[in-house]
Every structure is written in structure tokens, then in C-alpha cells.
Amino acid sequence: MYKQAVILLLMLFTASVSAALPARYMQTIENAAVWAQIGDKMVTVGNIRAGQIIAVEPTAASYYAFNFGFGKGFIDKGHLEPVQGRQKVEDGLGDLNKPLSNQNLVTWKDTPVYNAPSAGSAPFGVLADNLRYPILHKLKDRLNQTWYQIRIGDRLAYISALDAQPDNGLSVLTYHHILRDEENTRFRHTSTTTSVRAFNNQMAWLRDRGYATLSMVQLEGYVKNKINLPARAVVITFDDGLKSVSRYAYPVLKQYGMKATAFIVTSRIKRHPQKWNPKSLQFMSVSELNEIRDVFDFQSHTHFLHRVDGYRRPILLSRSEHNILFDFARSRRALAQFNPHVWYLSYPFGGFNDNAVKAANDAGFHLAVTTMKGKVKPGDNPLLLKRLYILRTDSLETMSRLVSNQPQG
């Protein structure tokens, strides 16, 4: 724990130090553990074998920093020495300077890394399980086996496709309303209403299997290839801002140490809490929103645009870009009392058109989510992101299939 705390402090200084002191290649003199920040946590991300060359950046403490995925890794200085003789990093095709491919691999076990795309090659080291790591290229060896080319410590390395999987995207889960079974007499057949029992079981399932719950900021980093995230991760979202979220979802999420995002219809925020009535759709008050801020991040679900017209179509689809932009701006102002960084939007009823997308961009939203079914992948249009529903009647096996690394529709 002490070592990880030191590394966390180092991350605050690495950028400025490395700008002044250029990276240099050094060689490991023994097998060395490496650390990096993955999501919210500083964890051991693998090891590098003795005799391997990597480019490191000097730091002010007893660790070197080096490029690891979309961030920095750290290695004890005592494991390295200046490169001896004429050894050099192989890069005959200039792959080190090529852009990344918008694709990651995921590790589900300790995964061997090699110096060349061949199982007979000298081992470089190991990547730990539960990582997403960016891929430069996919290659075929002479036996027609697929290899992933990666960049680590400003050098090339290779992972067999037999040892890792392609990253099929992050699951953004969508919820709305939650009720206890015995009080749910009006919304039992409404697909957007789940039960407290089902929600608790789903969150317990995620917790027991080591899933991290990500913020929208982290999702943005994933889409834009700027952050290292774990393989087992989901984003939990609630649309509308219903009172049942604070009454039922919040205690469950807090119990399991999870975080979530609530997309709020700001015109429906109440000045004072309403008396609980499970037979109506009630919305959270100012005080109720403040009480759940330690778990929930509040983002926009528009101000007055969460309505339908006479044909049951989202009213947003008939509004001008100017009117939509005005509403988006009003929603952001209303949420500023809870969150100074209102950067994310959920389109009402999942409806959008060119006017809505342009207004979202002009309003300053970094990401916007829809109700289109599927997972989010690096390089996706940030203002047209997909999500997944898990229904009250869905089994845990269905949930497992949705959040696992299987492709979705």
C-alpha cells in the first residue's frame, strides 16, 4: 500500500518532469513488477522479464515512469540499468510511430507477452488479468495464428490471440424506475420499471464478479482513447430523475460501493420532497438530489423536452436547432448547483435527429447516449452512443451475456 501511495503521488509530477527530462532506454536486470492506474485504482499490471529494453522517464523518487497503454506505468529504479553494448529496440517498419487502431485487447488471465509474433520468441513479460490494452496491429504468423502487436515502454511487443480477446465494447446499462414487487400495482408491465429485488441481485452479481462501475468521464476517456480501464467494467445510468432512484437504487449502490449517473429532467426537480406514492411517477427534490451525490453524478436529460407530441413521437424531433440548444443550455444551468461539469446528455426517449446532435455539440456536451441497443466502442460517434437494457424479468444469465465481452447487436 505504501508503494502504491508513492506511485499515486508520482503521477502528479510525472508529466512535468518528463517534459524536462526526455525518455531514455534502459534494460531490466531482473524480473520486475510494474504498476499503473487502471480506472480508479493503482494496481499491479504485470511484470517485465530480465534483459528487456524499455524507454523510461526519470522521476523525482525511486521509480521510473514509462508509457503503458493510454497512460503511465511505473517500475522500481533498482530493476533497471543503462543498456549495455549495441542492443536496440527493433522497429524496422516504423510501427512505433504509427497511430493506434481504435481497438483494444482484453485480458482474462495473466497473459504472456513476447518479443516477436511467435510462441518460440523470447518472452517480454506478462500482462495481468482484467486489463484493456490498445492494439497497434493484428498480424499472422507462419502458422496463420493471429497476434496482437502492442506498444509498451516505447517498444513493440506481441500477444497471441489465443491468450487474449478483442475488446467488444463497454456496456452502458439503462434503468428508469424501481419499485418493490408488493407495491408495484401500476407499472408491473412497464418495461422501464424494475424491481428492488432484481436490481439488488444484479448489482450483487456485478460486485461478486469484480466489475468496476465507471463514471461518464471515464466512458469519455474510453471512447476517445485517453484512459486505461479494467476489462470487467460497466456504466450504470438512470434516466428521468425519479424519486424511486433515491429511495431504492441509492442504498443498493452505496452498499456495494458503486457509482452511477442520473440523467435529470431539470424542469421536474421538486423544491421539496414529495410524500412517497408508488402508484405515480414522482421526481426527486433538491434535497434528495443532494443526499445521493456521493454515489450519483447528475447529467442532462433536457429541461422541457422530455415530452411527446400527439403522435407519441419525442417532441424534440419537431423542434428547431435553436430551440433545442436553448433547452440544453437551460438544463445545464439548472444542474450547475449540483455539478459544475454538466458534460453529458441523454436524449429524451432516445430520440435524436441532425438538429439535436448539432445542438448537443454546440451546447458543449462531450457525450450523448441514445436508446439504440449495443455496446460503446473506442472511436464511436460520441454524441450517438448505444446502451443496453436489463429488464426486471431478465435472468442473471442474461445479464452475464450482456455485460461480458460478447458482441452485442
UniProtKB/Swiss-Prot annotation:
PROSITE patterns associated with the record: NODB
Domain NodB homology: 232-409
Gene Ontology terms for molecular function: hydrolase activity; hydrolase activity, acting on carbon-nitrogen (but not peptide) bonds
Superkingdom per UniProt: Bacteria
Alphabetical GO biological process terms: carbohydrate metabolic process
CDD domains: CE4_yadE_5s
Record's keyword terms, sorted: Signal
Extent of the signal sequence: 1-19
A Pfam family: Polysacc_deac_1
Segments passing through the bilayer: none
InterPro entries assigned to the protein according to its UniProt record, in alphabetical order: Glyco_hydro/deAcase_b/a-brl (IPR011330), NODB_dom (IPR002509), Polysacch_Deacetylase (IPR051398)
Coiled coil (UniProt feature): none
Protein name, as recorded: Uncharacterized protein YadE
Source species of the chain: Escherichia coli (strain K12)
